Amino acid sequence: MAKIEFVGIDEYLEKLNKIGDKTTGLCKRALYDGAAVLADAVRSEVQALPVTDRNTEPQQVLSYERDGLLAGLGIAKMKDDGGVVSTRVDFDGYNRLKSKTYPNGHPNSMIARAINSGTSKRKKNPFMSRAVAKAKAKAESAMSARMDADINEIMK
């Protein structure tokens, strides 16, 4: 009968256990890199929105709406829901147009949804869908590169 002898298997198993212990942290770092790529794509799409300073053209975005979206764009805190790590690129805060209904200003997330999906008075401009389509492959490769680099660092 043949005999096989492995050398260094204990060290290899120890490194694999280190990766297993740090999985959530590794995933969060990789996810953040992917979200950063997506946030950059969304920012460029928001900057490319057609802008006007008059409220008479329904398909146009008002300049203060775009400025509010750019100021409120960010990456949300990471959530760990039973081993599923997630985050989102979203719009936070308010723009400068105050009203009786919105004394702090209109919520940027509401403005983004209205621009993206359209309303009865505004033609839709799906900038988020375009940003996701443009950035998906780059975000996946950024996450993969981060994960590979972190795993290679542990496996040294």
Regions found by a protein language model. Name each.
Residues 1-25:
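N-terminal, Lys/Arg- and Ser/Thr-rich interaction peptides
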